[in-house]
């Protein structure tokens, strides 16, 4: 009888394996719950891709020398895209070059096939430098709200000497400022305090938005980005629609979707640095007549824009968490995301057995 209680070595091993499998299954189930899905939304050029890059710098592996070298061609292409946009705008806005030689320089840049650019020739660099110094081009740059020009244009063009050196390797800031429109869906998972934050970036242009629907399952939080500086700009896809009006309408659509009833909403009012610069010469009241605050007042402008978005929320019980951000400033994003992470974890305490 006593012999029945004694397990053979094989049976003991079999039980051990079964117990291990059970433990692993429990761990897997727990791990599946320990993943947060953050959906990054917003209209085109609001800063979503830059924010993802910051997550890689702050919470991931960052950008090695080799990674940064991979952005060299894109930096060159951004420079040509910006300069060609200004050259075209010189014609449409009927601005004259002050230096006659710049008509020829403009032709040199016009002939460049941007998507085939992989280097900068000496002739091209000289043409870019002379054009950028021309008072006509500077006037054209000052009127950039009247056409489409990337926010990084001035950053790259004022630093053309550094970028044109043969040994040029893009810095972290160069990488953050590279503009490549997001097509399709980009996922970036990173681990924080044993919880996986899966950040999903989708294209913001209208043509990309129909792809969003597949991302809507089990979203923990929506992070919606607004470009504060777009209050006086029109859409790339439709030149008589105000960008901020489009963004505001999209925000209302997103927060009233049935899919997101249980998702927290975090609003990033981004590009605060550009707003501070622009509000000094482009008055908010010219584009939003309901604005009653003083001119050239950054705080009043920020508060007004925040309220515009808060007013889109029909459910007064639902809290919208808001932060003013500058997506190209790593310290700012590190600070803001620490607060966001705490908010998300607080809201999901029970799910992660933290209470």
From Swiss-Prot:
Chain positions recorded as GTP binding sites: 42-49, 176-182, 201-205, 270-273, 327
Which biological process annotations from GO are given for this protein?
action potential; adenylate cyclase-modulating G protein-coupled receptor signaling pathway; phospholipase C-activating dopamine receptor signaling pathway; signal transduction
List modified residues, type ADP-ribosylarginine: 179
User: Do you know which Pfam families this protein is assigned to?
Assistant: G-alpha (PF00503)
Per the UniProt entry, the signal peptide is none
The molecular function terms in GO held by this entry are:
G protein-coupled receptor binding; G-protein beta/gamma-subunit complex binding; GTP binding; GTPase activity; metal ion binding
For whether the record's keyword set contains Transmembrane helix, the answer is no
Question: Which branch of life, at top level?
Answer: Eukaryota
Cellular component terms per the entry's GO annotation: cytoplasm; extracellular exosome; heterotrimeric G-protein complex; plasma membrane
The record's annotation in SMART domains points to: G_alpha
Q: Which residues bind Mg(2+)?
A: 49, 182
Q: Where is this region: G1 motif?
A: 37-50
Q: Does the keyword Zinc apply?
A: no
Q: Where is this region: G3 motif?
A: 197-206
Q: Where is this region: G4 motif?
A: 266-273
- Region G2 motif: list its residue ranges: 174-182
Matching PANTHER family: GTP-BINDING PROTEIN ALPHA SUBUNIT (PTHR10218), GUANINE NUCLEOTIDE-BINDING PROTEIN SUBUNIT ALPHA-14 (PTHR10218:SF213)
Family, per entry: Belongs to the G-alpha family. G(q) subfamily.
* Protein role: Guanine nucleotide-binding proteins (G proteins) are involved as modulators or transducers in various transmembrane signaling systems.
Assembly, per entry: G proteins are composed of 3 units; alpha, beta and gamma. The alpha chain contains the guanine nucleotide binding site.
Protein's name according to its UniProt entry: Guanine nucleotide-binding protein subunit alpha-14
Gene name of the record: GNA14
């Amino acid at each position: 009888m006593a012999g029945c209680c004694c397990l053979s070595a094989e049976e003991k091993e079999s039980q051990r394996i079964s117990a291990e499998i059970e433990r692993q299954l429990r761990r897997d189930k727990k791990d599946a719950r320990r993943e947060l899905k953050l959906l990054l939304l917003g209209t085109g050029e609001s800063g979503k891709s830059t924010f993802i890059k910051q997550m890689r710098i702050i919470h991931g592996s960052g950008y090695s020398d080799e990674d940064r070298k991979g952005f060299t061609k894109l930096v060159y292409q951004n420079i040509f895209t910006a300069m060609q946009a200004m050259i075209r705008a010189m014609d449409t806005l009927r601005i004259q070059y002050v230096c006659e030689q710049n008509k020829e320089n403009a032709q040199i840049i016009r002939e460049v096939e941007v998507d085939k650019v992989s280097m900068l020739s000496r002739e091209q660099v000289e043409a870019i430098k002379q054009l950028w110094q021309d008072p006509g081009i500077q006037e054209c740059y000052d009127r950039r709200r009247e056409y489409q020009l990337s926010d990084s244009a001035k950053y790259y063009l004022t630093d053309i000497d550094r970028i044109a050196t043969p040994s040029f390797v893009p810095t972290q800031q160069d990488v953050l400022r590279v503009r490549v429109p997001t097509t399709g869906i980009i996922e970036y998972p990173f681990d924080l305090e044993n919880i996986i934050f899966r950040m999903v970036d989708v294209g913001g242009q209208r043509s990309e938005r129909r792809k969003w629907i597949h991302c809507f399952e089990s979203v923990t939080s929506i992070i919606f980005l607004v470009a504060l500086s777009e209050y006086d700009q029109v859409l790339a896809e439709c030149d008589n629609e105000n960008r901020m009006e489009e963004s505001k309408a999209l925000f209302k659509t997103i927060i009233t979707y049935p899919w997101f009833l249980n998702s927290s909403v975090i609003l990033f009012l981004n590009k605060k640095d550009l707003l501070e610069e622009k509000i000094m010469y482009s008055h908010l009241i010219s584009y939003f007549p309901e604005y009653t605050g003083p001119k050239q007042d950054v705080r009043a402008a920020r508060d007004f824009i925040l309220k515009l978005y808060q007013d889109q929320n029909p459910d007064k019980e639902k809290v919208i968490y808001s932060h003013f951000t500058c997506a190209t400033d790593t310290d700012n994003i590190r600070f803001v995301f620490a607060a966001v992470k705490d908010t998300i974890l607080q809201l999901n305490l029970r799910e992660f057995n933290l209470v």
